[in-house]
């Protein structure tokens, strides 16, 4: 997992705040960090999500929560390892569709109806 230092914490957002911003009209942007592959009818890869505004001047990466790691208070970016996990998260946010980029570097944007 990628980690973000405390001085970068303003660039991240928790799930609760993410949900609030989605309901206020912000967009969820899914980024594929590692190309997906299919194994036994399951798509595996690495995806991260950030919340953005329409003109892309506001961007924050989704994080699960703060956790203690060694002596440092560290924040980890939430990574989705399967397309099913990603789709389940988007559905729990209220999205009625999911467009999952399968190639590394691919991006898709989601909004609430």
Pin down the residues of each PLM region.
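Short N-terminal "domain-start" leader segments
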Residues: 1-59
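Short, compact, well-ordered microdomains
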Residues: 71-112
């Amino acid at each position: 997992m990628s980690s973000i230092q405390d001085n970068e914490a303003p660039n991240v957002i928790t799930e609760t705040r993410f949900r609030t911003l989605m309901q206020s009209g912000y967009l969820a942007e899914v980024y594929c960090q590692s190309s997906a592959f299919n194994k036994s009818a399951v798509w595996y890869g690495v995806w991260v999500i950030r919340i953005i505004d329409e003109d892309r001047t506001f961007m924050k990466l989704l994080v699960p929560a703060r956790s203690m790691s060694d002596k440092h208070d560290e924040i980890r970016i939430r990574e989705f390892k399967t397309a099913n996990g990603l789709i389940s998260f988007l559905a729990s946010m209220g999205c009625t569709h999911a467009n999952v980029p399968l190639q590394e570097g691919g991006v898709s944007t989601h909004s609430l109806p």
